Swiss-Prot record:
PANTHER family: CYTOSINE-SPECIFIC METHYLTRANSFERASE, DNA (CYTOSINE-5)-METHYLTRANSFERASE 1. A putative methylase that probably protects DNA from cleavage by the MjaORF1200P endonuclease. Belongs to the class I-like SAM-binding methyltransferase superfamily. C5-methyltransferase family. Signal peptide: none annotated. This is Putative type II methyltransferase M.MjaORF1200P. Residues 5-366 form the SAM-dependent MTase C5-type domain. The lineage of its organism: Archaea, Methanobacteriati, Methanobacteriota, Methanomada group, Methanococci. Keywords: DNA-binding, Methyltransferase, Restriction system, S-adenosyl-L-methionine, Transferase. GO terms for molecular function: DNA (cytosine-5-)-methyltransferase activity; DNA binding. It comes from the Archaea. Coiled coil: none annotated. It is an enzyme of class 2 (transferase). Its EC number is 2.1.1.37. It catalyses: a 2'-deoxycytidine in DNA + S-adenosyl-L-methionine = a 5-methyl-2'-deoxycytidine in DNA + S-adenosyl-L-homocysteine + H(+).
Length: 366
């Protein structure tokens, strides 16, 4: 009998970080996510149940409705829903055996004792998670100028401390916290916080998703109590990732077309590969938006409010095409409206990268 390694995902989003771990044979016990659409996406993909907190120590099961591009759901699933999910592959041999608790609430209101009630006597091997990066990213023109204010003063930046709090209470064998490279500006403070909860070794592992088969560029830092240096793989181009979707109909979930803003429609045919309609100023760099992708190159970094134009067609990428750029399998679904789906995808960890990290951790825990 194979014993599955067990993990918790804090700030789980739609499940990109968890997807890589599940594909590598890990079992999610609990996931916490404030956004309702993202929480439903997570439950949908990993056969979970969604709870919300009604008072200290007491939770209720949520009844949710969802939409994933071609199929409406109610929760829990009815027989026809389950048949469709099995046919698509969302409920496959790995996921149908899972039953994570998805807490749809503010992590600041969740105590480790409440998490322990859900997991009962199961031991948590790993805690993963990606606290929001807005407080640290150079793309945010309003981030605090003093790096330490980003960690200790900024409301969003302080969520890193909530991650550390729960890690300290549950004491997993390994923790992995994802964020933008800007978080290294408070490296000393974060190391101090982790050492205070019992983790002497703290590594800031900088990884590029494209080094592990992801079709878009993404450089992120993974703070952990182990060194993470996965074996690199062959890069994949935009057209290799999304080319076949030009010939697939709407039976592919989340493959719905979003309209280009009216001001771009008459000019879109003139936009060359790699060019953008607009540029916006971050804290320390200029970023393009509505970018025509080059078919034979990597896509630029996928973000929640960043849109791409198809290399050969004068339209925006669909959420499914955008998900392919983050190496999601087509059986991973995104619940909610089309804008919500774009946001969920852009704010997640690319699956190819999360899977590479999971392999390193699995080897470490042997």
């Amino acid at each position: 009998m194979v014993i599955m390694l067990k993990f918790i995902d804090l700030f789980c989003g739609c499940g990109g970080f968890s997807r890589g771990f599940v594909e590598e044979g890990f079992e999610p016990l609990v996931a916490i996510e404030l956004n309702e659409d993202a929480a439903f996406s997570y439950a949908l993909n990993f056969n979970g149940q969604i709870y919300e907190k009604i008072r200290p120590g007491e939770f209720k099961l949520k009844e949710l409705k969802g939409y994933v591009g071609i199929y409406p759901f109610k929760f829990p699933f009815e027989e026809e829903d389950i048949k469709w999910l099995k046919r698509l592959g969302t409920l496959n041999e790995k996921t149908k055996k899972l039953s994570p608790v998805v807490i749809n609430d503010d992590i600041r209101e969740i105590h480790a004792i409440e998490i322990e009630k859900f997991i009962k006597n199961k031991k948590v091997d790993v805690i993963i998670g990606g606290p929001p990066c807005e407080g640290y990213t150079g793309a945010n023109p309003k981030r605090e100028k003093n790096p330490y204010d980003r960690l200790y003063k900024d409301e969003t930046g302080r969520l890193v401390l909530e991650y550390i709090r729960i890690v300290g209470d549950l004491q997993p064998k390994i923790f992995v916290m994802e964020n933008v490279p800007g978080i290294k500006e408070v490296r000393g403070a974060i190391i101090k916080e982790f050492r205070e909860i019992g983790y002497e070794d703290v590594y800031f592992n900088t990884l590029r998703a494209e080094d592990y088969g992801n079709p878009s560029v993404r450089r992120r830092v993974f703070v952990s109590n182990i060194e993470i240096n996965p074996e690199k793989t062959q890069p994949k181009t935009v057209i290799e990732a999304i080319g076949d979707l030009m010939y697939k109909g709407r039976d592919v979930p989340n493959h719905e077309f979003a309209a280009l803003p009216a001001r771009f429609r008459k000019r879109v045919h003139k936009l060359g590969w790699g060019d953008a309609f607009i540029y916006f100023k971050g804290a320390n760099r200029r970023l393009g938006n509505y970018i025509r992708l080059h078919p034979l190159k990597l896509a630029e970094t996928v973000m929640g409010k960043r849109f791409f134009i198809h290399p050969y067609e004068d339209r925006l990428l669909t959420p499914r095409e955008q998900a392919r750029l983050m190496s999601y399998p087509d059986y991973h679904l995104f619940a909610g409206g089309i804008r919500s789906c774009y946001n969920q995808i852009g704010e997640s960890v690319p699956v190819a990268l999360s899977r590479a990290i999971a392999r390193v951790i699995k080897e470490n825990l042997k």
